[in-house]
Swiss-Prot record:
<feature type="binding site">
    <location>
        <position position="323"/>
    </location>
    <ligand>
        <name>S-adenosyl-L-methionine</name>
    </ligand>
</feature>
<protein>
    <recommendedName>
        <fullName>Uncharacterized RNA methyltransferase SpyM3_1024</fullName>
        <ecNumber>2.1.1.-</ecNumber>
    </recommendedName>
</protein>
<dbReference type="InterPro" id="IPR030391">
    <property type="entry name" value="MeTrfase_TrmA_CS"/>
</dbReference>
<feature type="binding site">
    <location>
        <position position="344"/>
    </location>
    <ligand>
        <name>S-adenosyl-L-methionine</name>
    </ligand>
</feature>
<dbReference type="GO" id="GO:0070475">
    <property type="term" value="P:rRNA base methylation"/>
</dbReference>
<dbReference type="Pfam" id="PF01938">
    <property type="entry name" value="TRAM"/>
</dbReference>
<dbReference type="InterPro" id="IPR029063">
    <property type="entry name" value="SAM-dependent_MTases_sf"/>
</dbReference>
<feature type="domain" description="TRAM">
    <location>
        <begin position="12"/>
        <end position="70"/>
    </location>
</feature>
<comment type="similarity">
    <text>Belongs to the class I-like SAM-binding methyltransferase superfamily. RNA M5U methyltransferase family.</text>
</comment>
<feature type="binding site">
    <location>
        <position position="392"/>
    </location>
    <ligand>
        <name>S-adenosyl-L-methionine</name>
    </ligand>
</feature>
<feature type="binding site">
    <location>
        <position position="294"/>
    </location>
    <ligand>
        <name>S-adenosyl-L-methionine</name>
    </ligand>
</feature>
<dbReference type="InterPro" id="IPR002792">
    <property type="entry name" value="TRAM_dom"/>
</dbReference>
<dbReference type="InterPro" id="IPR012340">
    <property type="entry name" value="NA-bd_OB-fold"/>
</dbReference>
<keyword id="KW-0489">Methyltransferase</keyword>
<keyword id="KW-0949">S-adenosyl-L-methionine</keyword>
<dbReference type="Pfam" id="PF05958">
    <property type="entry name" value="tRNA_U5-meth_tr"/>
</dbReference>
<keyword id="KW-0808">Transferase</keyword>
């Protein structure tokens, strides 16, 4: 719909007004975009080409939010089979879009960010690498526990709230993880365990966290409680392990703070090991409750394989792995290069990376706890000259000081693994100003059914 002609009197929209609109696009977060009388509205569960009756939820200066009251025309790209609960909680905020169209949407997000932020339109963005089976892929679940209708429930919070929606089938989580969560929920109900109450700051059980090795099948169960004393723990452990022999680790975490953080500082192993083990690209990894480990093992392997292919490595190459975590990317590179130098600010992750290198008999990978900027300056003084710098930053992207420090080392290539197209495009623009040219762009779908997209890009020194 077009903006009104100059001078035309406009009735200002207010909350709960219902208007008919056409959806013209999707936002970068997967919401439908509708334009009406100069306003842009964002509408959940609405797709391009759809015509809807929209209830106004909120109006800002030039934009607003609405929700679907009725559909007049449905997009042929709509997946009609998805449970709306997954949209309401954000578990699968793109689940109403067919998977083929999800992949197209994610490619477009990368293209749009590169053009709008970095002014780049002359580099091909490849089609998004997708999953053959894009459901039940998550190897980790973090599930809040609350009282709903008088009983302990597990599920997810409604979007933009702390109202728990009970769920038994989490759609994108490994089905064995779902089974363990539901079994634990039912078991703790029988023991009359009190769920956490955020408002009153009472109750014992806050969260259930489960990890499962994609290849090993090993499972870890973490019970997050508000105090150290636990409930008939021997009986609970016995019943869980009897029903799930693959559970090799049961851990208690104590979080007594009024916070949205999942974990507190204190962990206690109640049963079995402190870690589970899984493999990725032929390397084995010890994974603790807190370890950062990609939640989609199959697609993480494709992501890392893409980064390795883009880097075009040889036995004479030296690679710097910034943001090295527990070593998963760097150790994947180590087999094909002279040496890998990894840096990570979290000391526990560095210890895990060192342990994982030893676990796999890898002797040419070195990990330090430091800021990347300081570590790179130290390595430069020691005469280390990387041919490739690999970066895998958090969503906020790279700092100016990091970019300057990486350029100062003079690598021929920078391989950038991104989880945020906008900050990636910003950083690419800066690298191009400093003498690097964007050569390759490959989106990878690590998070099917959601709006999130990972991307691997290659920058080459001009």
């Amino acid at each position: 719909m077009v903006s009104p002609r100059k001078g035309k009197r406009i009735r200002m929209l207010k909350k709960n007004d219902i208007i008919q609109v056409a959806i013209s696009d999707l936002s970068h977060e997967g919401a439908g975009v509708a334009k009406h009388d100069g306003f842009v509205f964002f509408v959940d569960n609405a797709l391009p080409e759809e015509v809807i009756d929209m209830r106004v939820l909120k109006v800002n200066k030039n934009s607003g939010f609405g929700k679907v009251e009725a559909y007049h025309y449905l997009s042929p790209a709509r997946n009609a089979d998805v449970n709306l609960t997954y949209l309401r909680t954000g578990i699968a905020d793109l689940g109403h879009l067919t998977y083929e169209d999800q992949l197209t949407f994610k490619k477009k997000q990368v293209q749009d960010s590169l053009y709008k932020i970095a002014g780049i339109s002359d580099v091909t963005v490849e089609s998004t690498i997708g999953m053959t089976e894009p459901l039940a892929y998550r190897n980790k679940a973090q599930v809040p526990v609350r009282r709903v209708n008088g009983q302990l429930e597990t599920g997810f919070f409604r979007k933009h709230s702390h109202d728990l929606i009970p769920i038994s089938d989490y759609y994108i989580q490994d089905k064995e993880i779902d089974r363990l969560i539901n079994f634990t929920r039912d078991l703790l109900r029988r023991f009359d365990i009190k769920p956490y109450d955020e408002t009153e700051q009472t109750g014992l059980l806050r969260n259930i966290v489960v990890r499962r090795g994609h290849y090993s099948g090993e499972m870890m169960l973490v019970l997050v409680t508000t105090r150290p004393k636990v409930f008939r723990v021997d009986q609970v452990i016995e019943k869980i392990v009897e029903a799930f022999p693959a559970v090799v680790s049961i851990i208690q975490n104590i979080n007594d703070k009024n916070t949205n953080a999942i974990f507190g500082k204190d962990f206690k192993t109640l049963y079995g090991k402190d870690t589970i083990t899984d493999s990725m690209l032929g390397n084995n990894y010890a994974i603790s409750a807190q370890s950062f480990y990609q939640v989609n093992t199959v697609m993480a392997e494709k992501l890392y394989q893409t980064a390795i292919a883009f880097s075009d490595l040889s036995k004479d190459d030296i690679v710097i792995d910034a943001y090295s975590g527990i070593g998963t990317i760097g150790l994947s590179f180590a087999k094909t290069v002279k040496a890998v130098y990894g840096v990570e600010v979290i000391e526990a992750a560095v210890r895990d990376a060192q342990h994982n290198a030893a676990l796999n008999g890898i002797t040419n990978a070195y990990f330090v706890a430091d800021t990347a900027e300081h570590a790179m300056a130290t390595w430069a003084k020691d005469g280390i000259k990387p041919s490739v710098i690999l970066v895998d930053p958090p969503r906020k992207g790279l700092t100016e000081s990091f970019i300057q420090a990486s350029v100062a080392m003079g690598p021929q290539k920078i391989t950038y693994v991104s989880c945020n197209p906008a900050t990636m495009a910003r950083d690419i623009k800066r690298y191009q100003e400093l003498g690097y040219k964007l050569a390759k762009v490959q989106p990878v779908d690590l998070f099917p059914q959601t709006h999130h997209v990972e991307c691997v890009v290659l920058l080459i020194k001009e």
